[in-house]
Amino acid sequence: MPKRTLVTFPNDSLKEISSEVSFPLSEEDKSLIKDLKDTCVVEGGVGISAVQVGINKRIMLAAHDGELKAFINPVITSVSENNIINDKEGCLSFPGFFTKIKRYNNVCVRYYNEEGDQLIDSYEGFTARIVQHEVDHLDGIVMLDRMHRLDKDKFLRKRKRQYKKIKKVISQMMRSA
């Protein structure tokens, strides 16, 4: 099970827009999809995008019907504008952090599978939430961009305090070395 290293906030590469993948898939892309599956399973995730392992390609996985499904070059083509759910979300790139995010309860997505077949499928509920979250990653959008302003401010203040504590500990270690 080759696990890839996760890119975590505040790494700027999470804000980059991913490039489309061409077909037939290269061996490198096939290997990336397998590694994404392994990484997602090992990390206990329900979805992952290539950008989260430092690869800016439009490849993502989302849990659906008990398995991780690959979506290549996904595009959300329609949403249920009158059915928005505000629910908790986590992210492998924001370890241990969960916050409420508004998402459409139903989405229709056009994508390619690993064989290069173009598909159009509809998803609802939790799977729709995962698909939207991972497509956001491919578009350079992170949870912070979707959070309510007050939650975002609270998160950034907490993160700043954590960095100050870490900096202080490192400084003390350097002095005693």
Where are these regions (language model features)?
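Positively charged
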Residues: M1-A177
